[in-house]
Amino acid sequence: FAQQFGITLTGKHIRLSNGAMLRFLSTNASTAQGFNGHLYGDEVFWIPKFTRLHEVASAMATHDKYRTTYFSTPSAKTHQAYLVWNGDDWRGDDPARRAVEFPKESAMRVGCECPDGIWRYIIRLEEAVAGGLSARVDIERIRNRYNPTTYAMLYGCEFVDSKDAVFKFSELVR
């Protein structure tokens, strides 16, 4: 696929035609640092020891011109990344911050910047289908494939309680 765009994948880094460099780093907090630039984290709600990785890797995007972007299928509310998603990481123990309300889910469905400076955007399968994905996805077939809890997590962007999780995160990190 990459060859169609004149890009050779070598396992190191990729330099795009506009000069941008893509580096693929591990999710190991001891090795996923040291560069600067935009940070993109994929499937962060499934990364073990996310808190430590977030602390060190997000520093790569310290300059104002860089941003940190995390995207993921939700997992359990007990996952460390959920504290970043719901704002509790930012609130910490600060009484003033603990009193700050975050936007409702309806606002996040159109995208919004939250009090912690993080842009949150929820895209459920229903919105994607309404936006044109219907040419590639039969939503009723997908709904029929899963039980309601699993569908809500995988396609409805809903976090589940650990007891209802499709995959028990604590078992995955053993």
Write out the residue ranges for each language-model feature.
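Walker B beta-strand of ABC/ABC-like P-loop ATPase nucleotide-binding domains
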Residues: 39-41
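Inter-Walker segment of RecA-like/P-loop motor cores
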Residues: 1-37
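A general structural signal for short secondary-structure junctions and capping/turn motifs
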Residues: 13-15, 29-31, 58-62, 109-115, ...
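ATPase catalytic-site recognition across NTP-hydrolyzing enzymes
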Residues: 112-174
